[in-house]
């Protein structure tokens, strides 16, 4: 969903470098490959606990880029910045806040995806006859099922 949202944003906002944004969207969580242990355990590795997927992803991408002869250095920095800034805020784990439009767009798409996935999980667990579902810390709101969402699930 994150990549699809980024394609939409790139198609609607000409200031965005589509290639950079879509590449960043595809690879923004690549660090989770080494942050988490193999399936079915999916526990955090020691490196994952100590460094986190954001830093690990930027490092992995940086290492791969260095293997590509002639890769533009500024583009390499911008791609790594998008990965480092994709959580948007320092308190959400990003070592950097978005400083370029593509990093900001990626953050919006990733944040929207995470919050709507949370809402989906809350709705899926809820009784369709219960309107108010309580406060959720992640979305920072008291959650209510919309009539349309209940109708879709009947």
Task: Outline where the language-model segments fall.
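Short, surface-exposed polybasic-aromatic patches that bind anionic ligands, especially phosphate groups
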Residues: 2
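Divalent metal-dependent catalytic cores for phosphoryl transfer on phosphate-bearing substrates
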Residues: 7-126
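N-terminal intrinsically disordered, cationic/polar leader segments
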Residues: 107, 129-137, 146-154
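C-terminal membrane module of polytopic membrane proteins
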Residues: 113, 138, 143-144
